[in-house]
Amino acid sequence: MIDRYKHQQLRIGLVSPQQISAWATKKIPNGEIVGEVTKPYTFHYKTNKPEKDGLFCERIFGPIKSGICACGNYRVIGDEKGDPKFCEQCGVEFVDSRIRRYQMGYIKLTCPVTHVWYLKRLPSYIANLLDKPLKELEGLVYCDVCFDRNPNFSFARPITKKPTFLRLRGSFEYEIQSWKYSIPLFFTTQGFEIFRNREISTGAGAIREQLADLDLRIIIENSLVEWKQLGEEGPTGNEWEDRKIVRRKDFLVRRMELAKHFIRTNIEPEWMVLCLLPVLPPELRPIIQIEGGKLMSSDINELYRRVIYRNNTLTDLLTTSRSTPGELVMCQEKLVQEAVDTLLDNGIRGQPMRDGHNKVYKSFSDVIEGKEGRFRETLLGKRVDYSGRSVIVVGPSLSLHRCGLPREIAIELFQTFVIRGLIRQHLASNIGVAKSQIREKKPIVWEILQEVMQGHPVLLNRAPTLHRLGIQSFQPILVEGRTICLHPLVCKGFNADFDGDQMAVHVPLSLEAQAEARLLMFSHMNLLSPAIGDPISVPTQDMLIGLYVLTSGTRRGICANRYNPCNRKNYQNERIYETNYKYMKEPFFCNSYDAIGAYRQKRINLDSPLWLRWQLDQRVIASKEVPIEVHYESFGNYHEIYAHYLIVRSVKKETLYIYIRTTVGHISLYREIEEAIQGFSQACSYDT
């Protein structure tokens, strides 16, 4: 188990066999050391209990039920009495069953096995360190070298620290005709294993010996010297040779970086060859009973069984059968290597292994990699509880710190809080009754949901979260539909728009998370870019288009509209198709409320010109501007008509009224700006 307070990061790397043994072995109170899995069995078909020393053994991995051993005896966990802490009959400790989630086991391999990730994955780290072709190493690991009758194919290189057969210093071939008949005799004697390990050391054992003999610092020095020599030679004039030199220099750089990484992390190269194979905790590879009494098992269990079967067969060949032919032993070693390869990465050597239904087994690599792997699904980008996801749409009537949640999402996110509210108000006797009321969507449910949401912020996140403004908190309100409503000014921080983007909703549960959401993450508290300090809540995209449409009324003045032949034709068309209002007569309004009311009643359009009474104390006339027309009334009052405004004067030339020529769109924008300025002024007055 990982303690989140002690461990702030996770690193995957190579470990030594001693470390694997320390993780997987444990000493039970009677002094016995357990941890090795030796049998390929899971559960007994009659008793339905885990087999001893099998893949689900309770002695190795802990009890299935807390405080109950394999015999059925029960002990209180943590009891300080003198009772033994384990069962003397079955050897199972009386501990919590959650130990089966992290207690590992191990398989002691009869022959060394290379880790397929470091051999077959590109680039091959083993081939890089040994400076040998990958094909040659594969032939050595999978025992294809010793039995290929091709005269041009060579044996593996002998280990230099051992006395070798006929003092071999390099690869040797079937150069002498008599060797074809004399050498195979050595592989049929009883001392085959001793001869092989002493003389030619094939298989993964040869790789392990060569990796153990490496001096990483010498590799770095020699690679650097060779790299400098290749750089000093310069171009040869032959394009093919120049490409080979460039590839060689790149290889030397990668080799030096790899050797430095091994030195920096205190990892020995021979750890890339496995002698002990870790066995995952049983709760991470479960066997589940489904309807009808059938069992459903993880694919990893079957792959582990195959490894144990082949490993036990190899052990029997080397121990019980003294006269086993060498070819059979090496073939069995190859089967063990392939079984471990399939367990770690199925299909990396060609066709993947399939079950009886022609379904590919999911190996350890398939479990942890990809979008549905352990890391991305359950650790990094996992779908957590109390979260939802939906498409975002614009909410023009929302405040900057609010967001609209659909009822369907809100009732799921806050269901536990609603259940608690129903029970506290004695509207439901238990959880079951409360859930039934929620399913029936009774009116009281929505009332309690509204109360809960008023005091609980939510977090909105849009992937990819590239900076801290990619996740912000909002005060949720209920909306109809199935989409999340969002204020358009916060889109720039999320790098979002309303063309189908989706956002995730999270509910902060702990008090610390709620405090952080309220004090630091609210959208109206993040108005500046954390990178450069510029305002980030500025109109973009849809808002700019909306402002343009809102203020797109004609600005050419009354002269252009009245005396332009094109406009006269347009006015005639509008007068024909519009019966509610004659466009040739522009209406007069006393205030902005009357103008907006006429627009809502569809008496005028958004861009229709109109006359709005203006305040007398605000100057609108330029000093050198003269009226275009002057209309006189019978009582002596007269109207001075300018391009964008109109003044009503009395007989004594006193200004009675001032009208400005505008549109409903301009009026709406002006009112919004006026309200914003008034709110800012009030906020400043409160601060002072």
Curated annotation (Swiss-Prot):
Annotated residues for binding of Zn(2+): C69, C71, C87, C90
Compartment annotation: Plastid, Chloroplast
Matching Gene3D superfamilies: 1.10.40.90, 2.40.40.20, RNA polymerase II, clamp domain, RNA polymerase Rpb1, domain 3
A single GO BP: DNA-templated transcription
Catalyzed reactions per annotation: RNA(n) + a ribonucleoside 5'-triphosphate = RNA(n+1) + diphosphate
Residues that hold Mg(2+) according to the record: D497, D499, D501
The keyword Cell membrane is assigned to this record: no
Record's GO cellular component terms: chloroplast; DNA-directed RNA polymerase complex; mitochondrion
Cofactor(s) for this UniProt protein: Mg(2+); Zn(2+)
A Pfam family that the UniProt record links to this protein: RNA_pol_Rpb1_2
Function: DNA-dependent RNA polymerase catalyzes the transcription of DNA into RNA using the four ribonucleoside triphosphates as substrates.
Protein's recorded name: DNA-directed RNA polymerase subunit beta'
Origin species: Sinapis alba
Gene name of the record: rpoC1
